[in-house]
Amino acid sequence: MSRRKQRRPQQLISDCEGPSASENGDASEEDHPQVCAKCCAQFSDPTEFLAHQNSCCTDPPVMVIIGGQENPSNSSASSAPRPEGHSRSQVMDTEHSNPPDSGSSGAPDPTWGPERRGEESSGQFLVAATGTAAGGGGGLILASPKLGATPLPPESTPAPPPPPPPPPPPGVGSGHLNIPLILEELRVLQQRQIHQMQMTEQICRQVLLLGSLGQTVGAPASPSELPGTGAASSTKPLLPLFSPIKPAQTGKTLASSSSSSSSSGAEPPKQAFFHLYHPLGSQHPFSVGGVGRSHKPTPAPSPALPGSTDQLIASPHLAFPGTTGLLAAQCLGAARGLEAAASPGLLKPKNGSGELGYGEVISSLEKPGGRHKCRFCAKVFGSDSALQIHLRSHTGERPYKCNVCGNRFTTRGNLKVHFHRHREKYPHVQMNPHPVPEHLDYVITSSGLPYGMSVPPEKAEEEAGTPGGGVERKPLVASTTALSATESLTLLSTGTSTAVAPGLPTFNKFVLMKAVEPKSKADENTPPGSEGSAIAGVADSGSATRMQLSKLVTSLPSWALLTNHLKSTGSFPFPYVLEPLGASPSETSKLQQLVEKIDRQGAVAVASTASGAPTTSAPAPSSSASGPNQCVICLRVLSCPRALRLHYGQHGGERPFKCKVCGRAFSTRGNLRAHFVGHKTSPAARAQNSCPICQKKFTNAVTLQQHVRMHLGGQIPNGGSALSEGGGAAQENSSEQSTASGPGSFPQPQSQQPSPEEEMSEEEEEDEEEEEDVTDEDSLAGRGSESGGEKAISVRGDSEEVSGAEEEVATSVAAPTTVKEMDSNEKAPQHTLPPPPPPPDNLDHPQPMEQGTSDVSGAMEEEAKLEGTSSPMAALTQEGEGTSTPLVEELNLPEAMKKDPGESSGRKACEVCGQSFPTQTALEEHQKTHPKDGPLFTCVFCRQGFLDRATLKKHMLLAHHQVPPFAPHGPQNIATLSLVPGCSSSIPSPGLSPFPRKDDPTMP
């Protein structure tokens, strides 16, 4: 450990030898080095000390101010024994008075030497000064503020302190003085500790700063080259001095700089952070400035630069290798990036000085190891181009401009994607791939178009407003405030109100118009007759208009907002009224426009019919000008007319897809499917809700309440326990459809079922749908995880839910339902089911139940016929039940519940797992999947095997969030997997093929 880190290393010797030396008065001078009273330099050789006194001409820059000093002579002359604290107090007191020199005393005070050595090793910092800085020859050794000391300028140095009071009489006990001395010692130790912490912080910051640059420092100037320093100075380690001198004071001499440093020496925080807020290449007085620039050519020493290269000093950072640059950049990159953002002027190099400015430090930190870091948010990018694109998100710069509509984009790729919208309308216009400065949007070219535009804005509006060419835009009818500005602009153009805004440029009229339009634009549904009354009311508010214009002239918005235009009625002095890019009509206005356009098209159709022209079908909202299947409200292009109709229903808030289990309605079939899977994966809820009258089980409480109301209303007889599960569910669902269908629910009739082509295109549209109702899918995530460990349920509970659902829901869940039916056939004895009712009771069912059952059955049969064998439902139906037995009949009819799995029309049952197959070949292929020691169930996603199906279900629900698709092996298994959300037919697992391997079965 160095002497600076020790706590008073010579204190014990001072306490032991002090009294004897002072009593004898013959202490040797070589044991106690002599200290200069002016510069506080200490020497062990008296000859060197005398030579230094002759050359030293500087007043002491440091004055230690501690109260309660004692006279060194009196304390040394005292022969009474003193405690250790008292001796240390005298050591601190002697520092206030001038130390004895060789001329005034034959032997210095015994307490001065050892203590002074400890103080010098812990507090003194030597700096080599240039000879030219002081204006002449002679070296200078400065001392940093002592521990617990305050540096003062020479002119403000106070007079020597008054002599301390004499020591107490011998009669007073030493215990009376222990308490104040101990407190004084504690205060000194505290100040010393604070000073050491400050110095440690400064050293760490300097090491990180210089280590981040990855530079190596040359050999420092040897002590022998420093003029005016003796041989004793070579034994002292030279440490860097962290001077708080400001750069504005560097033109003065070093003596004046040291004196001015005392003004800011009382602010250690600013001193510690000084080098972080000033460029390294600036005229900075502290010695590390030269170290930071040592990798560049060394400039000649200058009188105005006290921090030049002859102040190179050995510092602790020399021991650190150059590899600390990346670590330091990672530690300080974010903080300095924020500093660079706060002071952008520092990002540039110095004015041709060839020195490293602070901006260069930042640029080197932005690219640690070839990476590029954002100076605003400290994100790191792999290339400079990516960093520049990212910086545009902070600056708001959008350099790429569409030359058709004037919209701006941050990247060229976004502009390319946007420009595809204009390809159909403007095939002859080429996209401008080059950046267009935003300030050029203010310029109107000789052709009358804004700079960077290839198509007049009004031309695009005319095409959009032609009959059958999209929504016809009405001229904006602004409110009183906006019309006041418009009328005033008319006065400005005619010169009648030039006194309001004299010399106003032409384009500023457009700017003034848009300054009030975004917040005062009236709804497009305003009747045309109200425009004249509004203008008449404006004529009475001329003074308010002029006051408003005077405010608008002082706050003009950007001209970039004036590139999207609307047609005007001609009453304005300019050809069109501008509309900002961000401003758009409300959804209510868009719907009103759509209704008006449909009414106009209907009126045209009626007129053509009256005149004998051939009639057309019901007008579609889309048009040729806006694309074959483009929404005129949000300009979205859809895949087919059916998808467009569903899309318009979403704009209108329609929810035609209704869940028959809980009654919730959804806007898309995809949302309904996702919601219904939540019902399928929550078997625990089925045992919780049962009817108290007929003991029928339901999925949720809402359906149970409706069922109980039907019991109380007489719609269901109290002997409903004799009803079959399938029939009861159908009756419940049919009654629920009549009682709980809301105004936004429109189930499609059977005659309007979509074709397979439209169904596929509609599913594509559902994949593109962005406005998903996330809350509708909460049951999929929540209930799926709750029922992970539950056993497989029987088909009776599943058919209770599916029997009354629409054909859309039945299509989506047909495969899981069929598989669960096969599963239940195997484990039917293990589940508690109500006894199947006898056939005569089925004849007593009310008519609504039979009608609902027949409707659903017919709908599902119709869907199966339309889709043919391409439908997974049809494939599974043919394989699972035979071509002569429909799926609905197997699910809902009571006779199907009585059938044994092996009794249905030649079906073959597996002896191991109990599944039935239509042919012997399929059964043999299935039996190959069973190992010899028993059934093994394998996950199709991760190929993990399980001994029972329940464990596999839990694994697939928890690990893969999928519904286990238990289907017979073969090509239809892949079709079943395609119905599972998130599962495709091509599962990326090693060695998985559509047909299961013999040695690696998938599932029974």
Swiss-Prot record:
| Basic and acidic residues: compositionally biased ranges | 83-98, 820-829, 896-910
This entry carries the following GO cellular component terms, namely: nucleus
Q: Cross-referenced InterPro entries, in alphabetical order? A: Sal_C2H2-zinc-finger (IPR051565), Znf_C2H2_sf (IPR036236), Znf_C2H2_type (IPR013087)
Q: Does the record bear Glycoprotein in its keywords?
A: no
Q: Where along the chain is composition biased (Acidic residues)? A: 756-779, 800-809
The alphabetized list of GO BP terms reads: eye development; negative regulation of DNA-templated transcription; negative regulation of transcription by RNA polymerase II; neural tube development
* Keywords for this protein: DNA-binding, Isopeptide bond, Metal-binding, Nucleus, Phosphoprotein, Repeat, Transcription, Transcription regulation, Ubl conjugation, Zinc, Zinc-finger
What family is reported?
Belongs to the sal C2H2-type zinc-finger protein family.
Q: Give the protein name, as stated in the record.
A: Sal-like protein 2
Organism, as annotated? Mus musculus
Report which gene this protein is encoded by: Sall2
